[in-house]
């Protein structure tokens, strides 16, 4: 079993924020792969399903971004999993908008949701970094991260999220390179 956690803030007023792109990714994966209905569990919302032959628990922590690790840690301990069995989808300022990078381990790079996750489960989990771009000046970062995607970005957002969902089987199989490569090819078309 694997846990795939999407980071974001709960509630409708945050739904389209760039900071919630991890939640959006989980929603698309659940829809595209026919996951079970949402249940309230582990201080958040979960959906169970299969991607290929792998059982996956999608988790959207309800603890707000800065405490995301509490929910992820609780789910990981309940299922007696290791950090290597956890994948976290989140927004990344240091990547161009709609670019995807996968990495394992490392620090938080200023991301409070990742910092919380590290605090609760350690560093050795897989991260799906979803680019939101940097607004240019550090004074504009908070407004950018906590701002909605612009109308002009909606098509690119939908295309990127669809690519994540369509290529999720490579993640489930542990083929991170193929996941990134196939997403890049889809987004070029």
UniProtKB/Swiss-Prot annotation:
Assembly and interaction partners: Monomer.
Subcellular location: Cytoplasm
Transmembrane segments: none
GO BP annotation list: protein quality control for misfolded or incompletely synthesized proteins; rescue of stalled ribosome
Annotated family: Belongs to the PTH family.
Catalytic activity field: an N-acyl-L-alpha-aminoacyl-tRNA + H2O = an N-acyl-L-amino acid + a tRNA + H(+)
Annotated site, Discriminates between blocked and unblocked aminoacyl-tRNA, chain positions: 9
Site residues by UniProt (Stabilizes the basic form of H active site to accept a proton): 91
Lineage: superkingdom: Bacteria
GO molecular function: peptidyl-tRNA hydrolase activity; tRNA binding
Active site: 19
Binding site for tRNA: 14, 64, 66, 112
One Pfam entry name: Pept_tRNA_hydro
Organism of provenance: Erythrobacter litoralis (strain HTCC2594)
EC number: 3.1.1.29
Described purpose of this protein according to its UniProt entry: Hydrolyzes ribosome-free peptidyl-tRNAs (with 1 or more amino acids incorporated), which drop off the ribosome during protein synthesis, or as a result of ribosome stalling.
GO cellular component: cytoplasm
Listed name of the protein: Peptidyl-tRNA hydrolase
Keywords linked to the UniProt accession: Cytoplasm, Hydrolase, RNA-binding, tRNA-binding
PANTHER family associated with the record: PEPTIDYL-TRNA HYDROLASE
